[in-house]
C-alpha cells in the first residue's frame, strides 16, 4: 500500500485561523474566493479581545461589537498571498480589528 503513495506528490497544507469584526466577513470570504481558497469554515459569532489594542467583541450591552472567525486550509504556497490581502483589509479599517494565525497541518482525511 505504501507504494501507491510513493509517486503521489503530497501537498503541504497550512491552516489559517482568521478572527475579525463581523463587518469584515464579506471581505474575508471575497479574499478567499479570489485567491481560489475554496474550502473554509466560518464561525458566525465569536467573542474575544485582541492582545494588543482594540475593544472587546462580546456582543453585550457594554461591549456591543461582535466578532466572527474563519478557518481555512490552504496550500503552503498560497499562505503569503492570503496574509497579504488580509493585512491590506486590516490596515484599511484598523479600528475594526483582524488577526490571522497560521498552523501546520500534520494529517487530514
Question: Model regions: which residues?
Answer:
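Positively charged, small/polar-rich N-terminal and surface patches that mediate targeting and assembly
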Residues: 1-109
Amino acid at each position: 500500500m505504501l507504494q501507491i503513495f510513493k509517486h503521489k506528490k503530497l501537498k503541504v497544507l497550512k491552516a489559517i485561523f482568521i478572527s475579525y469584526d463581523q463587518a469584515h466577513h464579506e471581505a474575508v470570504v471575497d479574499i478567499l474566493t479570489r485567491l481560489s481558497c475554496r474550502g473554509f469554515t466560518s464561525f458566525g459569532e465569536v467573542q474575544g479581545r485582541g492582545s494588543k489594542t482594540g475593544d472587546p467583541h462580546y456582543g453585550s450591552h457594554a461591549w456591543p461589537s461582535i466578532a466572527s472567525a474563519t478557518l481555512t486550509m490552504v496550500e503552503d504556497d498560497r499562505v503569503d498571498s492570503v496574509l497579504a490581502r488580509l493585512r491590506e483589509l486590516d490596515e484599511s479599517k484598523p479600528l475594526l480589528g483582524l488577526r490571522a494565525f497560521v498552523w501546520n497541518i500534520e494529517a487530514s482525511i
